[in-house]
Curated annotation (Swiss-Prot):
Record lineage: Bacteria, Bacillati, Actinomycetota, Actinomycetes, Streptosporangiales
Organism the protein comes from: Thermobifida fusca (strain YX)
NCBIfam families (alphabetical): DapF (TIGR00652)
Gene field: dapF
Name the record gives this protein: Diaminopimelate epimerase
GO cellular component: cytosol
InterPro entries: DAP_epimerase_AS (IPR018510), DAP_epimerase_DapF (IPR001653)
PROSITE patterns for the chain: DAP_EPIMERASE
Gene3D superfamilies assigned to the protein according to its UniProt record, in alphabetical order: Diaminopimelate Epimerase, Chain A, domain 1
GO-annotated molecular function: diaminopimelate epimerase activity
Active site: 85, 216
Length: 274
């Protein structure tokens, strides 16, 4: 089976070209591909499929994806299906560009959170219209070294963004955060962030279905939204272990800009992974 490998600020993905929707991608296969010792290793899988070939209904927020030629079928490293991935969309867009599947510098990508407008910038970065950012109220979690409190946010997927007073490098993210089921019935990504200079945040994240990752695009947006006073627009640089991205918040929506690179292509023997 053909694959490519790419990353956005070191949030890395196995990319599976499947334009006609012929691949039977089950959770066990995804988990095996993402295994860093016995597989290819990644934080998730991006299946590249034409929207018209998708074998699932697109309703609710996802309905706008029906107008897109290409759909990003994103899976977490444990094989679970996810709605949206900000770094993943940028890597997906870079793959479409380098594979010759798009010709314009601006286009839309379908996701389970809806259509996302993408711009391939002249400086090499990729900007994604992340859509509306919804502030849902306060929330809390228990980390390995104690409780944290923050803001529940939806960026097409659920987040708990927690401002901390200490350097984020000191926070223990070695274990899955304990969340309240009534606040997060489907789980959530948990971010810890701190403002280190005017307009600059540092952040780490524990991703639902993946553990701590080097970056999370939707988490970067969630942290920026949590750091912004209600009703205000803002521009933030967000530093994560894998690099940095820029978030622009305007009128309740967000744009995310950052790098995305394809580092390898090849064939994987699925029979060797099972």
């Amino acid at each position: 089976m053909r694959f490519a490998k790419g990353h956005g600020t070191e949030n890395d993905f196995v990319i599976l070209p499947d334009p006609d929707g012929e691949l039977d991608l089950d959770a066990a296969t995804v988990a095996a591909l993402c295994d860093r010792r016995a597989g290819l290793g990644a934080d998730g899988v991006l299946r590249v499929v034409r929207t018209k070939a998708l074998d699932e209904p697109l309703t609710g927020e996802a309905a706008t994806a029906q107008r897109c030629e290409w759909f990003m079928d994103y899976r977490n490293a444990d094989g679970s299906v996810a709605e949206m991935c900000g770094n993943g969309v940028r890597v997906f867009a870079r793959y479409l560009q380098e594979a010759g599947l798009v010709g314009a510098a601006a286009f839309e990508v379908g996701t389970r959170a809806g259509a996302r407008h993408v711009v391939l910038e002249p400086d090499g970065n990729i900007t994604v219209d992340m859509g509306p950012v919804r502030i849902l109220g306060p929330g809390s979690a228990r980390l390995a070294d104690g409780p944290v409190h923050g803001t529940r946010i939806s960026v097409g997927n659920p987040h708990l963004a927690c401002r901390v007073a200490r350097p984020v490098a000191e926070v223990d993210l070695s274990a899955p955060p304990l969340l309240r089921a009534e606040e997060f019935p489907q789980g959530a990504n948990v971010e810890v962030f701190r403002e280190v200079a005017s307009g600059v945040l540092e952040m780490r994240v524990y991703e639902r279905g993946a553990a701590e990752t080097r970056s999370c695009g939707t988490g970067i947006v969630a942290a920026a939204a949590a750091a912004t006073p209600p009703g205000e627009d803002a521009r933030w640089t967000v530093r994560v272990p894998g690099g940095e991205c820029t978030v622009v918040l305007e009128s309740g929506a967000a744009r995310l800009s950052g790098p995305a690179v394809i580092v390898a292509e090849g064939d994987v023997r699925l029979s060797a992974l099972r």
